[in-house]
Amino acid sequence: MRTVLCFEECLSLAFILLGLRHVERTCPHCKGERTKAHGRYQRLSDGARVARLRCLNCRRTFSKATYDVCFAQKKRHVNHPLWMLLVSGVSLRRVSKILRISRTTSARKLLFLGRVAKRELKESLLHKAKLECVEFDDMETFEHSKCKPLSISLAVESGTRRILGFEVSQMPANGPLAKIAKQRYGRRPDQRLIGRKRLLRFVRKLSKRNVVIKSDENPHYPPLIRGIFPRGEHLRYKGRRGCVVGQGELKRGGFDPLFSLNHTAAMFRANVNRLF
């Protein structure tokens, strides 16, 4: 007897529990609910037998796989191993070699899994209790060159380390690379404020009115947080040096008031290849 669920079954179960899945017997063409069985067919990608249905209103046919999150995918069997490899520090190129698929397929699967995860995260957060304490900060990385830096605005629930959301924004290079970056790539827009606002406005939907927001002493945070959380309390903590060179999320010694956020950021850097 099979007791282990495949990746698609886990996704389907999650969507059912979250109330996101459509009724399988509803016609996708006319939205009619009067349907009858119309045989079965064997799916080429994994050999599964899928039931077909005929709508009694428009007389058109569809299958129970129409509303599946993996609908029309021909390599659904690589979804789970690809997901496990990508969150284990493996690059897209190496994933393609390990699974013997093209880099284009890996990139498309990454986008698909990202959409599913983001949708599931948002729906699960909306059904949780209102937040009382949130930790918020930015971490930095870059695209293909350090002359093109990126800012990742991250918010987590204090104590539980539950990720509430993040936004990736372009930012101009600073320090010794600022002049070189401008010569090579021109002026780079600073979109950090837009990303922070988008993230904090989403967090506001999940939080109590008197929520506590913890952050470091970045001078750009207070006016932004006051505007979005007028009744909230903003606690600021002085930043400290990292305990390892190049890994600023892991703080040196003693009590860390932003441990939930810093630990989450450190896990990102340890398990996502592009953040190494």
Regions found by a protein language model. Name each.
Residues 2-276:
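Residue-level recognition of single "structural anchor" positions
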